[in-house]
């Protein structure tokens, strides 16, 4: 049988034992052991003995503590296994098969590496990657399933304001925008190489969003304009004017035909962008009493809950893709609108600025985050009642995203829905019946943390 200890480990053990015997006033026993293990007195002198004194006792007590910890963990594991075994099959089935009613509650990971506040987050449409952008001028790529930092992207010279994944399925890109007035495109399949920098805005670029099914990207800026870019060439193909102050946020409809924008002019504006060369301003929504920070299109699954409020009947087989939308404002409220510009409901509950919104892919809920440090869940089937409030961060919450769904029965596994790269909601333009919902939500905050809530 091979020895359990290396020669060095055995020598250390022998010296510790001899030091223990000497300290215990057992010199004859110590001398006998020294002879047995061939340790001469000049090798194990009084100075060496002093150095090893107490080492055996420390190792012994450490082993005892570890043994107790192991026993405690084994007991806890047995308790949890018993609880799992005793849970009813029906309850397990409900947890596993009812993502439409899932709401975030438990933080799976609290990820830390940024050196300043986190401004934005975005899920990769296919892989378990998530990007976060910060005032520290960097973008960090994480594995949200493992809770591990994968890489840090450097290139911007000022705060990173927004990030978004999108583009063609076979060539997904990450877009980022910054207070340095630039937009950068990064290629995930090439170690996130910065393949292009888009210049044209005259002030802070506050938001970027890919348009589904097209090689186009929309950006919003403090220069009061929005721009549409061709990501294959890097050229600006259209500048959209209309807002009279800083454009804070943009959202793209699930079919890619409509753009929704909000700004410091306290307006929300709906645009038809189906023909880029002839963009049409459809509607201006008025009602907020302060700057509008964020916006989101409602997914098709929300139609059944919001249509009665708008006096509409059963959802037609084909809609304009922009039936309902939501806005969040510095007046602490959230408003739900229809495409006619009518405010259907105002959600009151936050105690400070509303910073980000996302609709539940199941359509029944709207989620929001705020400078009041909370994440709130609103039930659209109960007149927008707030049904859950979470203390999400230790300071202002800046950003919120829902992981995009994955298309079912797609060979090769490359079947993510086209949505996270298109809209904050993380759902695509495909038939919802063909999308498998993922119960994963991410938030970012002034506490420099990225948090992952997962079912």
Swiss-Prot record:
InterPro entries, per database record: Dynein_regulator_LIS1, G-protein_beta_WD-40_rep, LIS1_N, LisH, PAC1-like_LisH-like_dom, WD40/YVTN_repeat-like_dom_sf, WD40_repeat_CS, WD40_repeat_dom_sf
Region named Disordered: 408-431
Any Gene Ontology biological process: cell division
Coiled-coil region(s): 61-88
Per-repeat ranges for WD: 113-154, 156-196, 200-239, 242-281, 287-347, 349-388, 392-438, 440-455
GO cellular component, one term: microtubule
Record SUPFAM superfamilies: Lissencephaly-1 protein (Lis-1, PAF-AH alpha) N-terminal domain, WD40 repeat-like
Keywords: Cell cycle, Cell division, Coiled coil, Cytoplasm, Cytoskeleton, Microtubule, Mitosis, Repeat, Transport, WD repeat
Main subcellular localisation: cytoplasm
Pfam families: LisH_PAC1, WD40
Residues in LisH domain copies: 9-41
Stored HAMAP family: lis1
Physiological role: Positively regulates the activity of the minus-end directed microtubule motor protein dynein. May enhance dynein-mediated microtubule sliding by targeting dynein to the microtubule plus end. Required for nuclear migration during vegetative growth as well as development. Required for retrograde early endosome (EE) transport from the hyphal tip. Required for localization of dynein to the mitotic spindle poles. Recruits additional proteins to the dynein complex at SPBs.
Cited PANTHER family: TRANSCRIPTION INITIATION FACTOR TFIID, TRANSCRIPTION INITIATION FACTOR TFIID SUBUNIT 5
Free-text comment about domains: Dimerization mediated by the LisH domain may be required to activate dynein.
Subunit text: Self-associates. Interacts with nudE and dynein.
Annotated family: Belongs to the WD repeat LIS1/nudF family.
Protein's recorded name: Nuclear distribution protein nudF
